Amino acid sequence: MDIVITGPESSGKSTLAAWLSQRLGLPLQQEEARSYLGGQSGYLPSDLIRIQERQSQREMALADAPGAILDTDILTLMIWWREKYGPLPILFNDAWHRRSPRVYLLCRPDIPWEPDPLRE
């Protein structure tokens, strides 16, 4: 079963995901949005769709593992899209219904904010 680390920006998700991966001996899927948008100064709706596609491909590559630690997943992209653009494209809903069984750990922003070019 996969464990998804989710929550608002600067709440320790990536740190917790890396720690759990090491502690439990499960593969870590890092946040796809961070990899994809790393050098960009902005993004478009098409970028979020591409991030979802890449994230889904990476999740499928882990399908044979007994479980994985995911530093965010489709849920984060769905919330992001709704906040920025409104109603979700059907492909996000389809991806939500196709996902594997998961446990969600929700982080809260009770640690100091760390500025980052990708944070809004």
Q: Where are these predicted regions, by residue range?
A:
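Conserved substrate/cofactor phosphate-moiety recognition/catalytic segment
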Residues: A18-M60
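A glycine- and Lys/Arg-enriched "phosphate-lid" helix/loop adjacent to the NTP-binding pocket
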Residues: Y85-E120
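Hydrophobic anchor at the beta1->P-loop junction of P-loop NTPases
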Residues: I5
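Conserved lysine of the Walker
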Residues: K13
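Walker A (P-loop) ATP-phosphate-binding motif of ABC ATPase nucleotide-binding domains
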Residues: D2
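The conserved Walker
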Residues: E9
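A basic- and aromatic-enriched beta-loop-alpha substructure that forms the phosphate/nucleotide-
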Residues: P66-E83
